[in-house]
Amino acid sequence: MKVHVRKNDTVVVISGKDKGKTGEVLRVIPKTGKVVVKGVNLVKKHQKPNRQNMQGGIIEMEAAINSSKVMLFCEKCKKATRISHKLLEDGAKVRVCKKCGETF
């Protein structure tokens, strides 16, 4: 499944319980079309004690959300935006903001 965002992109959640939150993409899972965003869709995981973590306990971590629920955030126009692709003269393919024309 094609995913329109990449790792380290800043995105805005456009639907669901975390609607309106902004965060950085930590991981992209193209096989399932999901992304993990920092500070979004937090779940509690019950961790058993092991050699690395002797204490164990309940930890809070980010769970994956569908990539269709996030939109790329443009730093120039300070809004969530759709993107288009543009070929530069040197043959490089870049992503462009549809609202202001800024390249990502």
From Swiss-Prot:
InterPro entries: KOW, Rib_uL2_dom2, Ribosomal_uL24, Ribosomal_uL24_CS, Ribosomal_uL24_KOW, Translation_prot_SH3-like_sf
GO cellular component: ribonucleoprotein complex; ribosome
Top-level taxonomic group: Bacteria
BP GO annotations: translation
Keywords: Ribonucleoprotein, Ribosomal protein, RNA-binding, rRNA-binding
GO MF annotation list: rRNA binding; structural constituent of ribosome
Function in brief: One of two assembly initiator proteins, it binds directly to the 5'-end of the 23S rRNA, where it nucleates assembly of the 50S subunit.
Subunit organization: Part of the 50S ribosomal subunit.
Family per similarity comment: Belongs to the universal ribosomal protein uL24 family.
Protein name in UniProt: Large ribosomal subunit protein uL24
Organism: Clostridium perfringens (strain 13 / Type A)
